[in-house]
């Protein structure tokens, strides 16, 4: 297809579909990570387009920490059922047995045990040799230098100094037994691209992305939504209703909301056009060196 005939979004769409089909043809046991957010929703939509009218030739995998927003769980189950997708859900049993949680053990330990170790357990359990992820290069500096085909050793570790060249849309998927590839079909998309494509294609998203009155507490300069009774209120903290939405979604005690009145997709897009901050400013796990994205990726995180 002549790229000159495609709009910017259609070029991105075509590239992503090409990558998804390439992985399905090249690897023996691929899986698509499904974290329930906007990027996962776009990636799933692209995968369904790639193999329409057939079904997906790989399952979805959600590595669950037990601390996602309730609306995320409802959306996950509804989506898998509506689209007829095979959904695998994995929780780290050792972490559950130890009662690991972000309030008691902190964001770094919670993320390492429930997310990173949970992910590695799931990949080993099912023997996946390729895993799709919805990460984009504009999100964060370590992701900006990562390849579309991201090689991982048999311990699931990423070495930024040992990456393969990717020239003219040619990807090297050769691996030895026990090694794997993380694949990022949305690498060249921006946050604005994602929202414009969601609007263009009428893709369903978790309602948390739209502004609404929600119960929040202000902590360390962030607005944390009180999603259930496990909240650990600190002295002086008061729960109040504010008009907020989320630019990124994760575990609710570690994800800050933003004050907003954007209740429709066009209003979100309008916000994006004037925004000067990263969507990951609301992620507690990105705020200190021990929780840096590159360090987590070296240890096996997505």
Curated annotation (Swiss-Prot):
It is an enzyme of class 2 (transferase). One of its GO terms (biological process) is hydrogen sulfide biosynthetic process. Coiled coil: none annotated. The keyword Transferase applies. The keyword ATP-binding applies. Pathway: Sulfur metabolism; hydrogen sulfide biosynthesis; sulfite from sulfate: step 1/3. Pfam families: PAPS_reduct (PF01507). Heterodimer composed of CysD, the smaller subunit, and CysN. This is Sulfate adenylyltransferase subunit 2. It comes from Pectobacterium atrosepticum (strain SCRI 1043 / ATCC BAA-672). The gene is cysD.
